[in-house]
Amino acid sequence: MNDQPFLQFDDLQEYVATRLGSEGWITVYEYTESDRQKIGYYCALVAPDAVSRCLENTSWDLLIGHGMPGFSFYPDGTHRYYRFGDDDGVEPFIIDRDFHGLKPSYKELSEEFRHFHNLYEDRRAGVFIALDDNGDDVEVVRTTPKRVQVRAKYLKDYLAARGMHMLLFFEFDRWSEKSLGELGMEKQDEKRQESDYRYSRWVAPWEGVTNPSRKTFARIIGKKVIKGTENYRPSMGWGRENQQYEDFIIGVDDDGNEVHYTSDEEQLANYFGKNPGSPHYLTPVFFRKSVMAKYYNDPAKYRVEDGHVYCGGYWSLRLDNSHRDYVIVYLGDLGKLSHKEQLYWKSFNVLPDGGVSDVAFRRGILGEWADTDEPALSFKANYERFRDGWRKKHGWDLFKPLKPEDEHYWGTLHVPASENQKEFDDQVMALAKLLVERLNEREVAKYITVGPNEKGIAKFEKYLEAIGFPDRQRFITLLRNLNGLRSGPAHVKGRDYQRAAQHFDLEGKGLSHAISGLLVEATAMLVLLGSFSHQREPAKDDE
């Protein structure tokens, strides 16, 4: 192996001159060591007019551990406080927090940088995260105990906003077990400076004080200037200056070809005479039902409600999700989504097929109040209404709230868009959680005589009989068969599952229609029991 290029830093000289500071991720702190080299990176911020002074030498203008608040004391007995310890205009970006071995040390990222980009720290993953205009996570900083890297775009935007430059300090040590003579080399001492970097490089004999096996030592030390984004313009966060608008299918022409039109509301007509002859803002755009899978599958981030989908508090989209076959969104509303989200919706765009649902028409056009008739949305609305009404009437919950670890079942409950067995099993599990597992057995037991080994549904059957609910057998049959279907995903699909599958006619109806029918039946039972419960109040069993 020829050690000369390695010890002369041929690779690093080219790297410093060209790529250092211009890659997608910039290492702003590192202290690592391997068998043959030691790597050190650090950084600091300086004003542009201080750069020439800093490039007069290769020394680091800020040492690791420095840059903390402090005082300067003067001969006349006065003193002055400095935010970063002195008045040389050098500002730390990575702060080494050390507590003299009494507490764990750690690296702290500039508070102003964190606040500027509103970064969230995920300490478990060792990353700082920003939210893009779609509400999606973007890793901005990656940290380990020995390395900190920053995404270049976010760093350079920050530098531009501050009107500052970054000095990226570097120091590499390399060594060899061969002497200079054995390597065919001589001592070297080189200094190099350009407009944006300066370094010193040398190769010398190593006396072997700390490690006798090392006979040759090489070092390169210096700094490079990283500037902010050119022509940086801060965003107002709500303007149109960077928005992109996708075209969507809005109909067909006389030959049956698809007609597309932009979702930019500035090019759409409205009821006030804007852009006459253009498609209206309220032109319905049709999408496959499967467009909603993304939102149902991530309930921690998204919330699907009757007529809306929400991404936390970041954005929302008005939609018609009461339609039997499609999800429908007005053309102008699509333009309010981020471009990334528009592209997602566009991939599910289909030709118009009729109009909006009756529910959406009555609400949006006629201005009437209308309950949704979409099975999952209707079930959720009636389930909440039932629980509230029951609690007000009786003072206790018939269906207890979901456990925190099960709350996602509520957000993911929907009618599957396809005949997917796993998706079907997930919806069955969600319904079983809500209607069977969360039955308040303790309260129900106060009104009946509980037999040996009687469980939730059996107790509930006795309770319904005790209060004289006329449709109790229909309700209990529904719950028993729902529990039977649940035994499929929960266990092995055995006899109980087969019996329930036959009851709900899974083979004849298909999985999606079966869930739809199950939700409709469950909703009907809640409405009947809710209405009945307001008429009668059972007396507690005295036995």
Label the predicted regions.
Residues 501-509:
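Acidic, Ser/Thr/Gly/Pro-rich intrinsically disordered interaction regions
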Residues 2-318, 332-481, 514-521, 525-543:
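Amphipathic alpha-helical interface elements
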Residues 473-502:
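Histidine-centered, metal-coordinating catalytic motifs and their short helical/loop contexts
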